[in-house]
Amino acid sequence: NEVGLYMDARDRLWGVENGRDTLTDSGTDIHNGNPGEEVNLVDGTGASYYGYSACYSEFQRTGGLGAGTQWADTTLDAAELKTDAWCRDPANVHPPVFAMPAHWAPLGIVEYQGSQLPIGHDLVVASHGSWNSDNPVGRVVARLHRSGDAVTSYEVIVGERGPDGALRQGQWNARPVDVREAADGTLYFSDDLGGRVFKITYRK
């Protein structure tokens, strides 16, 4: 369920995926921390199937194997049902580059090329946020730290300041939709809660 798409300077397609809501696993409710919202790179290598909807990415679960691990969605009909082993085989499923927190609902992605912000050529994601967790999360614009093509971690640039992007007392009154870079390296993001466009600046 890829939503935000971006073609980089090497003509490779990056995407951010919105995972499903109300997720259970063999009857156990795991929706608060799962599925992780995926960052995918379509570069012509490996499997052409990226897992949705037969498989999902772990973000945080009891007895889990780590963020980004693929699991089979046990709620599917028997004809569509896969196994965990099948989902983890890269010959079947192209693994994600990174798994962001569940229910962030990322909608926009861009690779920063400018110099106005001290973020190198990292990826920047605009996330709309979601209702489907006990503590609503994800109204953020986040930086995805990279090492080559690998994403190693995320950092909230603007929005809810909790490490999980959770809404806090006096919650931020915006819901990011997309993020774009202007020719001069300025970064802007749109907000459909207030019908606004914000400019991101760096204060030293």
Name these PLM-found stretches:
Residues 1-170, 174, 203:
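Beta-propeller domain segments
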Residues 180-204:
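Blade-level signature of beta-propeller repeat domains, shared across WD40, Kelch, NHL, RCC1
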Residues 176-178:
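Conserved interaction-surface patches within small, structured recognition/assembly domains
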